Amino acid sequence: MRRYEPIERSAAAIAVAVAAVALVAAVAVTVRGHDKVWAHAATTTSGDPQRGQAMFIQYGCGSCHHLTYVRKATGEVGPPLDGIAVRAVIAGKLSNTPDNLQRWIRDPQGVTPGTGMPDLQVGERDARDISAFLYTRSG
């Protein structure tokens, strides 16, 4: 069995420490980036993205729409919602603005009569929060 010299053990310990620091830094940057995205979505929509995620689930949006990393969002009837925050158009014809997204969520039949998206009687606050959550989904 090979015996390691103290200098080799020290070098290995330093390498492990550097790798650990790099990992912590990467996680911190990711968390900070996540927080910025969520804060921007909240500011843009005047909604609460965290509550919006709960409302997305409560209204059963995932039964029709797929959204990665959201439990019960495995639907295939409606369009997938990953990347909705960076789409130019929503509902097939509306500019992707917070007001338009909230209008679409609240009254899809009023926007496009006969659309497959049902009117779920989503209130103003819930629509604002759901739109805030969806605007966290840039890809």
Predicted segments with their positions:
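Hydrophobic membrane-insertion alpha-helices, especially the h-region
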Residues: 12-28
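Electrostatic cytochrome c docking/interface patches
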Residues: 32-57
